[in-house]
């Protein structure tokens, strides 16, 4: 019989580890010694990426040694003695009242944790830290069930800043199912943007396919930004209506955490043809080869616009 775990306990541990990851990232940034290495063209890795991932995975292994974990970076995982807390949500009224009972005994074999220890690494190396975040997603039988986003470089209003004296960090998390409210988000739509169609897409990997998608949707406003997690959050918090990246580049660790949060607020994420993303440890399926489209509403409308434009 498969071992089981309580999703509230696993989410508790991941929340705390994402926050501690933020401490690591801030410390590396403040040191000025980022230890930048290039994994490939325009794909940097820093000391903060490695230390963050080692801390998260090493800590999770102290409790759940058998759970499948997929992290962005290829690195050795050290032995860690300190166990992360699993009781952060034990007194959360929403969790107590609304978490489905079956979520408290999920078979470990059906779970995968996806970790992007430092999303928007390129922006991090350039000092544009407002879009930097740690992403942790948990999938169950191929579908997102919980997600955590931690933003290290934001102020008390949740706005990115380079002013170190204002860094307080922000945690956003959700468990999909049962109606547990998403924690840490707010509607950030500017009054002047009400009624507009706002599209967000890549800043650093803009190409002909991306331009074609923009032309197909014809947004009133275009937001080009770094970090898949950051752009997903723009949609989750209603700053953008749709995030389109219709080409290779994003990976499952970029989207699993945001995908869970998106589902919990009623949004949707698929590939640009409308096909569901299946979360797997298969190396051939880690990359979203057809790209992604993320919406808070009217998902099929945007799928149709892309299809009609292509045809």
Curated annotation (Swiss-Prot):
Transmembrane segments: none
Species the sequence originates in: Dictyostelium discoideum (Social amoeba)
Cofactor comment text: Binds 3 Mg(2+) ions per subunit.
Native organism taxonomy: Eukaryota, Amoebozoa, Evosea, Eumycetozoa, Dictyostelia
Reactions catalysed, as given in the entry: adenosine 3',5'-bisphosphate + H2O = AMP + phosphate; adenosine 2',5'-bisphosphate + H2O = AMP + phosphate; 3'-phosphoadenylyl sulfate + H2O = adenosine 5'-phosphosulfate + phosphate; 1D-myo-inositol 1,4-bisphosphate + H2O = 1D-myo-inositol 4-phosphate + phosphate
Active-site residues, record numbering mapped to chain: 49 (proton acceptor), 121 (proton acceptor)
Keyword terms, alphabetized: Hydrolase, Lithium, Magnesium, Metal-binding
Protein name per its UniProtKB record: 3'(2'),5'-bisphosphate nucleotidase 1
Keyword Magnesium attributed: yes
